[in-house]
């Protein structure tokens, strides 16, 4: 715990209190009237503040200090896994193209295990030994929120693009299957055994995927622990809210997240950003555009609320899934114009055979 000698066990006691959903794992500047002031504090996250304070039983009030350090109570709302269809604010209309069939499919579009709703294809990585490409997203996107306590997925499960929620004419594996579940880290509902990641990887079929993240491009590096700093600017490309930017609000936190088969799961050493996502954006890759290192993979977006979004860190993800940066995969060249299939939506009434007859006309000079 990066709190100058304070025992985390002392801080963890606040999780027993009403509405407490997490805490920062490092001392933070206290927030007063929306602005940070130069007073170190232990940040405690609650789903909502009870006002007036007198309405809250004394035994459920967060102490004003822990081991002599002031506490700072921050209201973040209910934090939920964002592959579910949730009532959280949207940034305009969901980008419709991202919910269509894409072949080859770029990161940033709809994807999912055949038993979920829909999430986001985060990025393309490589197996650390073989170098084979891997589709990377969240456990609750690619592995149906498989848990240590109860299993919901097996290796080889069908991965669909777009995700099931976006397939309106019935799932056809010949059309929609893009790969198979290969590896994942089970999540847990045990608050004392919190995970650091919600991540999984799938093996794609042949040349059906691209490495260039939609609206971002190829990754150049993987974030290190020292890179995670408050106010670091990040961007992401997601199924629902498309491309947008945010900043790190807490570089290391413990948080309880609901939406895992009706259970709440615990995560530690994850990071918060300013709100940048909605239901269906889970699995999006957080990217830092560094002047020195290029586009740096910083982690996977996996949860959020009406005021914050939560990511698991890149170095945890690649370490646990035994992956490395994918290099040397050139963009797939487009076929000749007369042979190129147009992109089409699965909810427009077309059959696959009808769609195959549609061609893109060559541009006229």
Label each region the model flagged:
Residues 174, 287-365:
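C-terminal subregion of chymotrypsin/trypsin-like serine protease catalytic domains
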Residues 90-270, 274, 279, 287-293, ...:
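Serine endopeptidase catalytic core focused on the charge-relay Asp
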């Amino acid at each position: 715990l990066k709190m100058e000698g304070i025992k985390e066990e002392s801080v963890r006691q606040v999780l027993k209190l009403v509405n407490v959903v997490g805490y920062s794992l490092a001392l933070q500047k206290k927030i007063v009237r929306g602005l940070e002031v130069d007073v170190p504090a232990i940040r405690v996250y609650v789903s909502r503040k009870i006002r007036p304070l007198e309405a809250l039983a004394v035994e459920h009030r967060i102490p004003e200090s822990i081991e002599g350090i002031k506490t700072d109570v921050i209201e973040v709302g209910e934090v939920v896994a964002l592959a579910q269809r949730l009532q959280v604010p949207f940034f305009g209309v969901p980008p419709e193209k991202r919910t269509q069939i894409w072949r080859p499919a770029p990161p940033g579009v709809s994807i999912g295990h055949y038993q979920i709703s829909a999430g986001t294809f985060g990025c393309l990585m490589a197996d650390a030994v073989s170098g084979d490409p891997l589709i990377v997203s969240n456990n609750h996107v690619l592995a149906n929120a498989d848990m240590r306590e109860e299993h919901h997925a097996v290796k080889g499960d069908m991965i669909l693009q777009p995700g099931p929620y976006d397939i309106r004419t019935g799932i056809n594996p010949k059309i929609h299957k893009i790969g198979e579940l290969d590896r994942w880290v089970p999540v847990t509902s045990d608050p004392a055994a919190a995970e650091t990641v919600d991540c999984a990887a799938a093996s794609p079929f042949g040349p059906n995927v691209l490495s260039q993240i939609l609206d971002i491009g190829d990754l150049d590096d993987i974030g290190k622990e020292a890179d995670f700093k408050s106010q670091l600017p990040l961007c992401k490309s997601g199924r629902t809210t498309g491309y947008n930017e945010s900043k790190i609000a807490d570089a290391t936190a413990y948080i309880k997240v609901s939406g895992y088969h009706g259970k709440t799961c615990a995560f530690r050493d994850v990071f918060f950003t300013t709100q940048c996502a909605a239901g269906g954006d889970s699995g999006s890759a957080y990217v830092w555009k560094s002047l020195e290192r290029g586009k740096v993979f910083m982690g996977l977006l996996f949860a959020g609320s009406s005021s914050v979004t939560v990511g698991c860190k890149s170095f945890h993800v690649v370490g646990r899934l035994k992956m490395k940066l994918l290099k040397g995969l050139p963009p797939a060249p487009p076929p000749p114009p007369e042979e190129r299939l147009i992109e089409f939506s699965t909810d427009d009434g077309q059959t696959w055979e009808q769609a195959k007859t549609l061609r893109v006309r060559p541009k006229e000079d």
